[in-house]
């Protein structure tokens, strides 16, 4: 059975990532890209994640947590405000209050345990490379501002989805991302000015086609 494609607003939503390796880093990057608040629980973290921390984890609070370094990290300051690292082993209570959990450790048994706990408590969970333990999976995606295209093979062939992503990148360019922003800015004005759905559809199509043909975003 294919997975249902659903785009979810993750802005400021709580996401837990268990694990501190390169796979965990990639998941952190994705979740930050879509505005989530990310908590990472791991006994140790890879260099890429370490670059997000304050003075290479030199400063921790009394709970063992440490936050991102806004001046010395590779993300923007907004993203830095949305990352918390907890340096210790995973505990089940870490999942409480989370809307999404990603088990990205190198211990399949632990990933399975995390997934089972989340499913029993109604929490969406992804166990990396353990399809049977996942209630959702990550697609390959392209993102230009608010314009997003995603591909999923249902976990069967990541290589195929990467191929599709590469082909789509030839079409979904930064220009289209900018054009999508423009279309959003004029949307309410067009809706107010034209009374029928058919008229609005015609106007939107004319504006879109003209912009693509000219290779230029119209001025508002």
Regions found by a protein language model. Give the residues of each.
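An accessory alpha-helical subdomain
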Residues: 155-220
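Glycine-rich, highly charged phosphate/nucleotide-binding loops
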Residues: 80-96
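Hydrophobic, well-ordered beta-alpha structural blocks that scaffold small-molecule cofactor pockets
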Residues: 1-44, 48-52
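E1/E1-like adenylate-forming module used to activate ubiquitin-like modifiers
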Residues: 127-176
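Alpha-helix C-terminal capping/helix-to-coil transition sites in glycosyltransferase folds
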Residues: 12, 96-97, 144
């Amino acid at each position: 059975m294919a997975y249902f494609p659903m785009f979810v607003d993750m802005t400021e939503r709580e996401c837990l990532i268990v694990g501190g390796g390169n796979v965990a880093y990639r998941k952190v990057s994705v979740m930050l890209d879509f505005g989530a608040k990310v908590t990472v629980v791991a006994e140790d973290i890879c260099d890429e994640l370490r670059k997000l921390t304050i003075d290479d984890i030199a400063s921790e609070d009394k709970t063992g947590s440490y936050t991102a370094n806004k001046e010395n990290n590779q993300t923007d300051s907004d993203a830095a405000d949305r990352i918390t690292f907890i340096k210790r082993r995973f505990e089940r209570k870490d999942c409480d209050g989370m809307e999404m959990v990603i088990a990205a450790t190198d211990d399949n048994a632990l990933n399975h345990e995390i997934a089972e706990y989340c499913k029993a408590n109604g929490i969406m969970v992804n166990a990396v490379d353990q399809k049977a333990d996942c209630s959702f999976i990550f697609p390959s995606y392209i993102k230009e501002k608010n314009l997003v295209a995603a591909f999923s093979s249902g976990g069967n062939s990541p290589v195929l989805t990467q191929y599709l992503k590469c082909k789509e990148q030839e079409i979904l360019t930064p220009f289209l991302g900018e054009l999508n922003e423009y279309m959003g800015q004029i949307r309410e004005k067009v809706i107010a000015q034209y009374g029928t759905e058919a008229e609005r559809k015609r106007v939107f199509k004319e504006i879109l086609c003209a912009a693509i043909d000219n290779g230029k975003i119209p001025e508002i």
